Amino acid sequence: MALRLLRLVPPRVGGIHTSVQFKLQYGPLAYILGEKATKKMTEKSKLITVDGNICSGKSKLAKEIAEKLGLKHFPEAGIHYVDSTTGDGKPLPVQFSGNCSLEKFYDDPKSNDGNSYRLQAWLYASRLLQYADALEHLLSTGQGVVLERSIYSDFVFLEAMYRQGFIRKQCVDHYNQVKKVTICEYLPPHVVVYVDVPVPEVQSRIQKKGNPHEMKITSAYLQDIENAYKGTFLPEMSEKCEVLQYSAWEAQDAEKVVEDIEYLKYDKGPWLDQNDRNLHKLRMLVQDKLEVLNYTSIPVFLPEVTVGAHQSDQVFQEFTELPGRKYRAGYNEDVGDKWIWLK
């Protein structure tokens, strides 16, 4: 379903539009003619992720790191990530955005309609698309990027959900299969920055924030997230990239964090083994978002995420009735596309 909808996603702005099929894009010819990623790389061409529990202050820190180092900041990918980066940027109705709800998860995490795992699966796909966008930006411009969480840390929520009995073992197996065939195609971050905030402090911040849905999050769920971070994520990532850990108080000093990042040796991880040929193949993948998403589709029946043929067709038809979604990008008169008959 996600693949079908993404094929019709139009660009943000309508107007006189030359043929989409002939839009200039990076490809083998550009590579042969000298378009090499390594030529654009500098000491600041790094992919940095900032991780931490809910309300840990990672968003503020990630933005400050990006500003101080001159990197591109990617806010955390949510349910409407695709909507925010395509079309007019406005969120689409829930049936076109994974048919899941974060608010419903907080209110009723054990809902028998499968919302909890549907949410987790959709968020992983959203993070995958964002990670591809971040890599594409890095490889095409040489400018480093800073993300809030990533496909490498997404599993901490899955583990917490399973330990709390929110999802079935079959859901965990499905997630791990999807992760296995997707994550192997990408390079890990150069740096992981982890903000360690104790669960009682996290709960205090949630209460202070005042979101009625988030206020229903249990301490046990938050503790399981922290345990997954410290017990699995950080040890695994320390073998692939540089890892920096800070307390809640230390993370407030963004200047010190940036200084630590600049002093890292970057002497481990798969980035050291990359050459222009490898990076060319990676860039070809990440710029093709349909191919990126295609890896998330595996032939396994799971009630939580399986959509029947008739329902799929109905949702697809409803999607094409939205403004600018009936035809390919540049061919929709209802959003201002002109000279369509000449294309």
From Swiss-Prot:
InterPro entries: Deoxyribonucleoside_kinase (IPR050566), DNK_dom (IPR031314), NDUFA10 (IPR015828), P-loop_NTPase (IPR027417)
Keyword Transmembrane helix: no
Cytoplasm in keyword set: no
Annotated Gene Ontology cellular component terms: cytoplasm; mitochondrial matrix; mitochondrion; respiratory chain complex I
Cofactor: FAD
Regions annotated as coiled coil: none
Modified sites of kind N6-succinyllysine: 110
Gene3D superfamilies the record matches: P-loop containing nucleotide triphosphate hydrolases
Entry note: cofactor: Binds 1 FAD per subunit.
Keywords: Acetylation, Electron transport, FAD, Flavoprotein, Mitochondrion, Phosphoprotein, Respiratory chain, Transit peptide, Transport
Annotated organelle transit peptide span: 1-23
GO-annotated biological processes: mitochondrial electron transport, NADH to ubiquinone
Subcellular location(s) of the protein: Mitochondrion matrix
Residues bearing PTM N6-acetyllysine: 110
PTM characteristics: Phosphorylation at Ser-238 by PINK1 is required for the binding and/or reduction of the complex I substrate ubiquinone.
Positions of modified residues (Phosphoserine): 238
Subunit-structure text: Complex I is composed of 45 different subunits. This a component of the hydrophobic protein fraction.
Family to which this protein belongs: Belongs to the complex I NDUFA10 subunit family.
Function in brief: Accessory subunit of the mitochondrial membrane respiratory chain NADH dehydrogenase (Complex I), that is believed not to be involved in catalysis. Complex I functions in the transfer of electrons from NADH to the respiratory chain. The immediate electron acceptor for the enzyme is believed to be ubiquinone.
PANTHER family: DEOXYNUCLEOSIDE KINASE, NADH DEHYDROGENASE [UBIQUINONE] 1 ALPHA SUBCOMPLEX SUBUNIT 10, MITOCHONDRIAL
The protein, known as: NADH dehydrogenase [ubiquinone] 1 alpha subcomplex subunit 10, mitochondrial
Organism listed in the record: Bos taurus
